[in-house]
Design a protein with these regions (language model features):
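Short acidic-glycine-tyrosine-enriched beta hairpin
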Residues: 62-80
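His/acidic/aromatic-lined binding-pocket segments of jelly-roll/cupin-type domains
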Residues: 38-41, 45-50, 67-68, 86
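A cytosolic small-molecule/anion-sensing beta-strand core signal
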Residues: 24, 51-52, 71-72, 90
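Ligand-binding loop in jelly-roll beta-barrel domains
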Residues: 80-103
Length: 103
């Protein structure tokens, strides 16, 4: 049993993570960041839940770039093949559930 206070977690570097669980090839990790990630496409599904802070999520659908602001409590689901990039608006803590070893 473990209790994690997400607001208390700060990584040593942007997108640093606290590994929470690995179940049947799926990982659950708490990330801290204050810098953008990179455009990428996951090889599996991804669940991206903002726990603290705000994140601009940019993604491409039908070749068009779109954007939405995710607030604390919001969840972004990326299906296989969804190209996307997360840009935090200040420090943010994000719970990510995805295939182990995904970008």
């Amino acid at each position: 049993m473990k209790i994690i206070r997400s607001k208390d977690f700060t990584a040593a570097r942007p997108w640093g993570a606290l590994d929470i669980a690995s179940m049947n090839g799926i990982t659950t990790r708490l990330h801290w960041t204050n810098e953008p990630y990179k455009w990428h496409v996951n090889d599996g599904q991804e669940v991206f839940a903002v726990l603290d802070g705000r994140v601009e999520m940019r993604y491409r659908e039908d070749g068009r770039e779109q954007s939405t602001i995710l607030e604390a409590g919001d969840i972004f689901y990326a299906a296989v093949g969804t190209e996307h990039v997360a840009l935090p608006i200040g420090p943010a803590r994000i719970l990510v559930v995805e295939t182990a070893g995904s970008v």
